[in-house]
Protein backbone atom coordinates (compact mmCIF):
# COMPACT_ATOMS: atom_id res chain seq x y z
CA UNK A 1 0.00 0.00 0.00
CA UNK A 2 2.75 2.45 0.90
CA UNK A 3 4.29 2.48 -2.56
CA UNK A 4 1.15 3.27 -4.51
CA UNK A 5 0.22 5.83 -1.85
CA UNK A 6 3.57 7.53 -2.49
CA UNK A 7 2.74 7.64 -6.20
CA UNK A 8 -0.71 9.16 -5.57
CA UNK A 9 0.96 11.64 -3.23
CA UNK A 10 2.38 13.31 -6.33
CA UNK A 11 -1.17 14.49 -7.03
CA UNK A 12 -2.60 14.89 -3.54
CA UNK A 13 0.28 17.02 -2.25
CA UNK A 14 -0.38 19.61 -4.95
CA UNK A 15 -4.09 19.46 -4.19
CA UNK A 16 -3.42 19.94 -0.48
CA UNK A 17 -1.44 23.07 -1.31
CA UNK A 18 -4.40 24.50 -3.20
CA UNK A 19 -6.65 23.46 -0.31
CA UNK A 20 -4.52 25.38 2.21
CA UNK A 21 -4.27 28.47 0.03
CA UNK A 22 -7.93 28.31 -0.90
CA UNK A 23 -9.01 28.05 2.74
CA UNK A 24 -7.05 31.23 3.53
CA UNK A 25 -8.57 33.15 0.62
CA UNK A 26 -12.08 31.94 1.49
CA UNK A 27 -11.58 32.86 5.15
CA UNK A 28 -10.27 36.34 4.31
CA UNK A 29 -13.23 37.03 2.04
CA UNK A 30 -15.69 35.67 4.58
CA UNK A 31 -14.12 37.88 7.26
CA UNK A 32 -14.42 40.90 4.97
CA UNK A 33 -18.09 40.13 4.36
CA UNK A 34 -17.51 39.08 0.74
CA UNK A 35 -19.47 35.82 0.91
CA UNK A 36 -20.14 35.83 -2.83
CA UNK A 37 -16.41 36.12 -3.53
CA UNK A 38 -15.65 33.38 -0.97
CA UNK A 39 -18.10 31.03 -2.69
CA UNK A 40 -16.69 32.05 -6.09
CA UNK A 41 -13.24 31.09 -4.85
CA UNK A 42 -14.62 27.73 -3.77
CA UNK A 43 -16.11 26.99 -7.19
CA UNK A 44 -12.89 28.02 -8.92
CA UNK A 45 -11.02 25.78 -6.53
CA UNK A 46 -13.31 22.85 -7.42
CA UNK A 47 -12.48 23.34 -11.10
CA UNK A 48 -8.74 23.70 -10.45
CA UNK A 49 -8.58 20.70 -8.09
CA UNK A 50 -10.66 18.40 -10.32
CA UNK A 51 -8.73 19.44 -13.43
CA UNK A 52 -5.40 18.93 -11.72
CA UNK A 53 -6.60 15.54 -10.49
CA UNK A 54 -7.71 14.48 -13.97
CA UNK A 55 -4.47 15.61 -15.62
CA UNK A 56 -2.36 13.85 -13.00
CA UNK A 57 -4.55 10.73 -13.17
CA UNK A 58 -3.86 10.49 -16.90
CA UNK A 59 -0.13 11.20 -16.56
CA UNK A 60 0.40 8.81 -13.65
CA UNK A 61 -1.50 6.00 -15.36
CA UNK A 62 0.41 6.48 -18.61
CA UNK A 63 3.71 6.32 -16.74
CA UNK A 64 2.67 3.75 -14.11
CA UNK A 65 5.16 1.20 -15.48
CA UNK A 66 8.29 3.35 -15.30
CA UNK A 67 7.27 4.91 -11.98
CA UNK A 68 6.53 1.58 -10.28
CA UNK A 69 9.76 0.14 -11.67
CA UNK A 70 11.56 2.44 -9.23
CA UNK A 71 9.77 0.73 -6.33
CA UNK A 72 10.08 -2.81 -7.71
CA UNK A 73 13.82 -2.57 -8.27
CA UNK A 74 15.98 -3.04 -5.18
CA UNK A 75 19.36 -4.39 -4.15
CA UNK A 76 17.85 -7.87 -4.58
CA UNK A 77 17.04 -7.09 -8.21
CA UNK A 78 13.93 -6.35 -10.20
CA UNK A 79 10.71 -8.01 -9.00
CA UNK A 80 8.09 -8.02 -11.77
CA UNK A 81 5.40 -9.62 -9.58
CA UNK A 82 5.83 -6.88 -6.99
CA UNK A 83 5.65 -4.21 -9.70
CA UNK A 84 2.44 -5.71 -11.11
CA UNK A 85 0.91 -5.77 -7.63
CA UNK A 86 1.83 -2.10 -7.09
CA UNK A 87 0.30 -1.18 -10.46
CA UNK A 88 -2.90 -3.10 -9.74
CA UNK A 89 -3.38 -1.46 -6.34
CA UNK A 90 -2.34 1.94 -7.72
CA UNK A 91 -4.91 1.85 -10.54
CA UNK A 92 -7.76 1.42 -8.04
CA UNK A 93 -6.35 3.99 -5.65
CA UNK A 94 -5.77 6.61 -8.35
CA UNK A 95 -9.29 6.10 -9.72
CA UNK A 96 -10.74 7.01 -6.35
CA UNK A 97 -7.99 9.41 -5.42
CA UNK A 98 -6.94 11.89 -8.07
CA UNK A 99 -10.20 13.61 -9.06
CA UNK A 100 -12.41 12.77 -6.04
CA UNK A 101 -9.78 13.86 -3.52
CA UNK A 102 -9.31 17.09 -5.47
CA UNK A 103 -13.01 17.85 -5.14
CA UNK A 104 -12.86 16.84 -1.49
CA UNK A 105 -9.90 19.20 -0.95
CA UNK A 106 -11.94 22.09 -2.35
CA UNK A 107 -14.85 21.24 -0.05
CA UNK A 108 -12.50 21.02 2.92
CA UNK A 109 -11.06 24.43 1.98
CA UNK A 110 -14.57 25.89 2.03
CA UNK A 111 -15.37 24.32 5.38
CA UNK A 112 -12.03 25.42 6.87
CA UNK A 113 -12.51 28.90 5.42
CA UNK A 114 -15.89 29.17 7.11
CA UNK A 115 -14.50 27.84 10.39
CA UNK A 116 -16.41 24.56 10.24
CA UNK A 117 -13.58 22.33 11.45
CA UNK A 118 -15.98 19.98 13.26
CA UNK A 119 -17.57 19.15 9.92
CA UNK A 120 -14.16 18.38 8.40
CA UNK A 121 -13.40 16.18 11.40
CA UNK A 122 -16.69 14.35 10.86
CA UNK A 123 -15.92 13.72 7.18
CA UNK A 124 -12.39 12.51 7.90
CA UNK A 125 -13.59 10.34 10.79
CA UNK A 126 -16.10 8.70 8.44
CA UNK A 127 -13.36 8.17 5.86
CA UNK A 128 -11.44 5.91 8.22
CA UNK A 129 -13.99 4.38 10.57
CA UNK A 130 -17.05 4.10 8.30
CA UNK A 131 -15.73 3.86 4.75
CA UNK A 132 -12.25 2.36 5.11
CA UNK A 133 -11.89 -0.09 7.99
CA UNK A 134 -15.24 -1.91 7.61
CA UNK A 135 -14.83 -2.29 3.84
CA UNK A 136 -11.24 -3.52 4.21
CA UNK A 137 -12.32 -5.99 6.88
CA UNK A 138 -15.15 -7.30 4.67
CA UNK A 139 -12.96 -7.63 1.58
CA UNK A 140 -10.19 -9.40 3.47
CA UNK A 141 -12.56 -11.77 5.27
CA UNK A 142 -15.11 -12.54 2.56
CA UNK A 143 -13.12 -12.39 -0.69
CA UNK A 144 -9.89 -13.75 -2.10
CA UNK A 145 -8.73 -10.40 -3.51
CA UNK A 146 -5.59 -10.21 -1.38
CA UNK A 147 -3.53 -7.03 -1.79
CA UNK A 148 -5.93 -5.80 -4.48
CA UNK A 149 -8.48 -5.24 -1.71
CA UNK A 150 -6.35 -2.36 -0.38
CA UNK A 151 -6.65 -0.49 -3.68
CA UNK A 152 -10.38 -1.13 -3.84
CA UNK A 153 -10.81 0.11 -0.27
CA UNK A 154 -8.86 3.28 -0.99
CA UNK A 155 -10.89 3.90 -4.14
CA UNK A 156 -14.24 3.37 -2.41
CA UNK A 157 -13.37 5.25 0.78
CA UNK A 158 -12.09 8.27 -1.13
CA UNK A 159 -15.14 8.39 -3.41
CA UNK A 160 -17.56 7.90 -0.51
CA UNK A 161 -15.76 10.55 1.55
CA UNK A 162 -16.01 12.99 -1.35
CA UNK A 163 -19.73 12.28 -1.73
CA UNK A 164 -20.23 12.76 2.02
CA UNK A 165 -18.23 16.01 2.09
CA UNK A 166 -20.23 17.34 -0.88
CA UNK A 167 -23.49 16.51 0.92
CA UNK A 168 -22.21 18.22 4.07
CA UNK A 169 -21.18 21.22 1.96
CA UNK A 170 -24.57 21.43 0.24
CA UNK A 171 -26.39 21.21 3.57
CA UNK A 172 -24.13 23.87 5.07
CA UNK A 173 -24.24 26.32 2.17
CA UNK A 174 -27.97 26.11 1.49
Put a short name on every predicted segment.
Residues 1-4, 172-173:
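Conserved small/polar residues in nucleotide/adenosyl-binding loops
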Residues 3-58, 62-64, 101-123:
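Small-residue-rich hydrophobic transmembrane alpha-helices
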Residues 6, 53, 128-129, 158:
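Residue-level recognition of pore/gate-forming positions within transmembrane alpha-helices
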Residues 12-19, 93-113, 119-128, 135, ...:
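Short runs within selected transmembrane alpha-helices of multi-pass transporters and secretion channels
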Residues 26-97, 140-174:
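Short alpha-helical transmembrane segments in multi-pass integral membrane proteins
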Residues 70, 131-132:
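Alpha-helical transmembrane segments of compact multi-pass small-molecule transporters, enriched
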Residues 132-140:
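Transmembrane alpha-helical segments of integral membrane proteins
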Amino acid sequence: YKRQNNINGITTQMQNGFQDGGASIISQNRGAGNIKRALGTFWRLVIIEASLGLIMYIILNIFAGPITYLFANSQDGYNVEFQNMIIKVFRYDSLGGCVPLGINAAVMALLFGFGKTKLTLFCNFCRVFVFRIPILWALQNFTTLGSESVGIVMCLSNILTTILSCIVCLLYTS
